[in-house]
């Protein structure tokens, strides 16, 4: 869905890419919908991995509606990992967050910093999702995963076609 974005992003992507990206509007918490979508793409033989950016992202809102964040952020990741296993997909790029570091002891923070208690439900969901992915890797060593821990991404594509949504 476009709860954190807007369909107009697709117009900007089309201008940059020179062709329209294919869109599958899917509730990532719906296992049946995920299976149908991955099956449809896999039948074409052109799926090599998954980029998982489907999550609620407002720290403040997460303190007001923590259950909503747990259900969506953790639920969608668990559902996706399950679907990936059923379809033999082994590569995942996960959009995590610097919030997994909690209140770090040292600044600047790098990848070797310890994971400390999260300061928000949003941060906690990212910690849990990272753990789910790491546990999936432990049980299936063929899984390749990258956990992207963003700080404050800002700016737009040089064309200004994408990158300025809140």
Tell me the role of every PLM-derived stretch.
Residues 53-57, 96-97:
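Conserved NAD(P)H cofactor-binding loop of Rossmann-fold oxidoreductase domains
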Residues 48-51, 93:
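N-terminal Rossmann-like NAD(P) cofactor-binding module of classical short-chain dehydrogenase/reductase
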Residues 5, 56-60, 101:
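Active-site beta-alpha loop architecture of Rossmann-like, nucleotide-cofactor-dependent enzymes
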Residues 26, 95-96, 148:
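Short glycine/serine/threonine-enriched helix-capping/active-site loop
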Residues 1-49:
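N-terminal Rossmann/SDR dinucleotide-binding element
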Residues 8, 36, 61-64, 75:
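Generic recognition of short, well-ordered alpha-helical segments
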Residues 64-79, 86, 90-91, 100-152, ...:
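Catalytic helix-loop patch of NAD(P)-dependent Rossmann-fold dehydrogenases
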